[in-house]
C-alpha cells in the first residue's frame, strides 16, 4: 500500500529500492450514501453536506485504509465536513451504513452493488477514470461535476533495483502482452478490476503523484495506524 511507507516508521523495504515493471490493474471505488440523505447526485450531496455540517458520519475499513484516506482527500477537496467512524473491514461498516447509523461509505463497487440495485443505498459516483461495468448507470466523479478527485486502488509489478535495464524492458513487454489477452480481461472483469497497463516510467509518475496526494491528506487529517 502507498500508505505504508508514509504511516509506518520501519518497513523491511523502501520504494526507492524497487524498479517498476509496469502497472497491471486498477480498481475504482463508489461513493455510497444512505437513502435518508435527500440527494440524488454528487453535486446535491456536497451542497447538502455543507448546509448541514456535523450531521454526517462516514465509514472506513480502518484507520489508514484506502476508504479512510480517500474520504479525507474528498473532504479536503470539497470542504465537506464528516466524522470518521473506522471499522475492521467492510462487513460491519456496510451493515451500519444500511441501518443509517453511518451515512457515507466510499468502498469497492462489488461490496455494495446489490444494495445499490435494491435501493437500500444510493451510489452517487464512481471514483475512477471510467464507469464501472457492473454499475454502468453510475457516473464518474468527473461526470458528476467534481474535477480533480480520483481514487483508484492499483497493482503494479516491481523488481529490485540493479536489475539490468534489458531485463526490466523484457519483463515489461511480456506483461503488456499478457494484459492484452482476452482471457486476462475476462478474469479481471470477474474480479471487479480493470486491466490497465502502464510503462515503467508512467508507473513511476503515477506512484509519485499518488504518494504526494496521500501524504498531504494523511498529514492534514493526522491519520495514524491503529
Q: Whereabouts are the PLM-identified features?
A:
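Short helices/loops that flank or line small-molecule/ion binding pockets
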Residues: 73, 77, 91-101, 105, ...
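Short beta-strand->loop
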Residues: 13-24, 59, 81-85, 103-104, ...
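Alpha-to-beta junction loops
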Residues: 52-56, 80, 98-107, 120-123, ...
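Hinge/capping helix and adjacent helix->loop/strand transition within the periplasmic-binding protein
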Residues: 2, 6-92, 141, 154-187
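Non-transmembrane alpha-helical segments in soluble domains
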Residues: 43-46, 94, 98, 106, ...
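An extracytoplasmic/periplasmic, membrane-proximal ligand-sensing/linker region
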Residues: 77-80, 117, 140-143, 165-226
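Conserved functional loop/turn residues at catalytic and ligand-binding sites
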Residues: 41, 86, 100-101, 120, ...
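Beta->alpha turn/N-cap motifs
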Residues: 1, 90, 107-112, 126-129, ...
